[in-house]
From Swiss-Prot:
This is 3-isopropylmalate dehydrogenase. The gene is leuB. NAD(+) binds at G278, S279, A280, P281, D282, I283, A284, G285, Q286, N287, K288, A289, N290. Mg(2+) binds at D218, D242, D246. One of its GO terms (cellular component) is cytoplasm. Its EC number is 1.1.1.85.
């Protein structure tokens, strides 16, 4: 008898509500016979905030924690000041659920046009540390709005936090092309950079089959557009990862075919999977949004739960659909139906 997994579903705002159901349908079809899913929907996002001022009520967060994984659609609304939902919902979940790996695959599918003249075979993944660095909220400001104002942002890197994400990267590389590239700026950020390098060297000794090298962040951004096929697993910190993942999305043709995961690799808390596109309020409710990225986020969820064969069904169906029909104009529902029909 197949095990039942509990999935927290946060459709969010805009097109998130339209694409998330297709991720759920893909989950169910791909895992048919090997896993069952029980969903709990959460009304969180811009619409909820505008309605009653709630961002992430404590009782709802506790219910989310009781699930095996989280599917997120998209969150955002131009009526809300930037940073409110990002910090109050997305970052709060990431930190409270200790989702210390931000995983962003980047693959150029046949049928998708890259902005690069000669992109080559692009298929790499960025492993970004997700709970430390400059995004952990350390810092402050004094004498605001005066000529003497001082503002600081403090980057915090711990050996514990770095080592666990380094180990994740090497384990992932063993399933791929067995190469890890550390990206940092250790010639300037000498304290953090040195610690990252030493830990990579130490962990690398435990994985003799995996080669590893190093690039400064500025060099890496150049190689991402001049020779992206050289990369397999890119390992980096929170800030540099934020920059590289956006660039990575652009070289494979944009956000329409890209998903990401915020991973708690210890499984102490649920991990969260989502398309990287936004809520796109300009096309919301018009059945125009492409659900492919949301469906790919379902594949990442299956991989995280250990159902690699089921995830492969989704990947194979998506690749075939994009190659044959990716350039055609289709509705949200038609794209979803076409992909599911190939599974």
């Amino acid at each position: 008898m197949a095990k039942t997994y509990k999935i927290a579903v946060i459709p969010g705002d805009g097109i998130g509500k339209e694409v998330t159901p297709w991720a759920q349908k893909a989950l169910e079809k791909a895992a048919e016979g090997v896993a069952d899913f029980e969903y709990e929907n959460f009304d969180l996002g811009a619409e909820r905030y505008l309605r009653d001022g709630a961002i992430l009520p404590e009782d709802e967060e506790e219910r989310i924690k009781a699930n095996d994984a989280i599917l997120l659609g998209a969150v955002g609304d131009p009526r809300i000041k930037a940073g409110i939902l990002e910090r109050g919902l997305l970052l709060k979940l990431r930190f409270d659920l200790d989702q210390y790996v931000n995983l962003r695959p980047s693959k150029l599918y046949k049928g998708v046009t890259s902005p690069l003249a000669n992109p080559g075979d692009i298929d790499f993944v960025v492993v970004r540390e997700g709970t430390e660095g400059l995004y952990c909220g350390a810092g402050g400001a004094v004498r605001r709005n005066t000529p003497q104002e001082v503002a600081t942002e403090v980057s915090i890197n711990t050996a514990y936090g770095v080592e666990r994400v380094v180990r994740y990267a090497f384990k992932l590389a063993m399933k791929r092309k067995k190469h890890v590239t550390l990206v940092h700026k250790k010639n300037v950020l000498v304290n953090a950079g040195d610690m990252w390098q030493r830990i990579v060297d130490k962990v690398g000794e435990e994985y003799p089959e995996v080669t590893h090298d190093y690039q400064h962040i500025d060099a890496a951004t150049i190689f991402l557009v001049s020779d992206p096929s050289r990369f397999d697993v890119i390992l980096t910190d929170n800030l540099f990862g934020d920059i590289l993942t956006d660039e990575a999305g652009s070289v494979v043709g944009g956000v329409g075919y890209s998903a990401s995961g915020c991973i708690n690799a210890s499984d102490e808390f649920p991990s969260m999977f989502e398309p990287i596109h936004g809520s796109a309020p300009d096309i919301a409710g018009q059945n125009k949004a492409n659900p492919t990225a949301a469906i790919l986020s379902a594949a990442m969820l299956l991989e995280h739960l250990g159902f690699d064969d089921a995830a492969k069904k989704i990947h194979t169906a998506v690749e075939a659909d994009i190659e044959e029909l990716g350039s055609t104009v289709r509705s949200t529902d038609q794209v979803g139906k076409d992909i599911l029909a190939r599974m």
